[in-house]
Amino acid sequence: PDNVPNQDLLTKHLELSLTAVPDPFECHDSFGAHNNAQLMSFLDQFGFDYDFVSSTKSYKSGEFDDTLMKVLEHYDAIMDVILPTLGEERRATYSPFLPICPWTGRVLQVPVIDRNLEAGTFTYQDADGQTYEVKVRGGDCKLQWKVDWAMRWAALDVDYEMSGKDLIESVRLSGKI
């Protein structure tokens, strides 16, 4: 975004989770922490009673593990919901799971080529043709946002989430998942 300082810093950290990107404003541990602080400051102005939940911590601590396993278990059904909403090119490479490269920390957008429910893993192939097996549990992957949204609702027992009219179709889609 043009309204964020230190553009070179951001460019160097493309494809990383925001909690792995240094804060371009230089006042928090990460860009994710900066954005979370901004959100909490805004909510605090109105006196809302809320429990802030860090997505990164929830993925890494295992809080989302059971629900991630349900996504793995229902992978085909989820794909049946998502794929019709995507263009042809994106359908060819889409996966609800986004592995995090153990060497670079980059969030990879690669298709899943195999799944092992018993082991709780999926396999993907990188651009060089190498295959890698990734654990669903423990923070080795994330989910694409519409599936992530549905997963959070289930994992965190969310009954209602506000959204603007620009997200109505996404709410419906995530509700199907």
Please give the residue ranges for each predicted region.
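N-terminal Rossmann-like or analogous alpha/beta NTP/dinucleotide-binding catalytic cores
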Residues: 1-79, 174-176
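Alpha-helical recognition segments enriched in aromatics with Gly/Pro capping
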Residues: 74-77, 84-177
